Swiss-Prot record:
It is found in: Cytoplasm. Pfam families: Urease_beta. The lineage of its organism: Archaea, Methanobacteriati, Methanobacteriota, Stenosarchaea group, Halobacteria. Belongs to the urease beta subunit family. Keywords: Cytoplasm, Hydrolase, Plasmid. This is Urease subunit beta. One of its GO terms (cellular component) is urease complex. The gene is ureB. Pathway: Nitrogen metabolism; urea degradation; CO(2) and NH(3) from urea (urease route): step 1/1. It catalyses: urea + 2 H2O + H(+) = hydrogencarbonate + 2 NH4(+). One of its GO terms (molecular function) is urease activity. Residues 128-138 have a biased composition (Acidic residues). The keyword Electron transport does not apply.
Amino acid sequence: MSDGLVPGEVIPGEGTVTLNEGRERTEVTVGNTGDRPSQVGSHFHFFEANAALEFDREAAMGMRLNIPAGTAVRFEPGDEQTVELVEIGGKRRAHGMNGLVNGSVDGETGDAVERMRAAGFGDTGEAAPDDGDTESDQ
């Protein structure tokens, strides 16, 4: 090319790029209870990650890994690691994945939590709230 440009060349701008500035963050400790590695991509709704991954799923509602786009974190069987999550941006909707949310990640999340528990997803979070109808209450 006569103008000095190279096809596909990336010419970075000056300065520093700050990722996810101003977004809520949290950390969760994740253990892989499965017998195979599990890899979670940068923009996957972490609440719905592989059922063999055990962590506080309610803390991960509306969150994704705080890593650069197009990258992933791999969880080996039997290993445990702490990861940083960041809130999902845009319209804050999650569709597909494991079918636990299929809509907004804001507001009432009780149905998604019930589906997660019924499907046997690993969860270290709080137990389901007591409905007050136990034998000891009677």
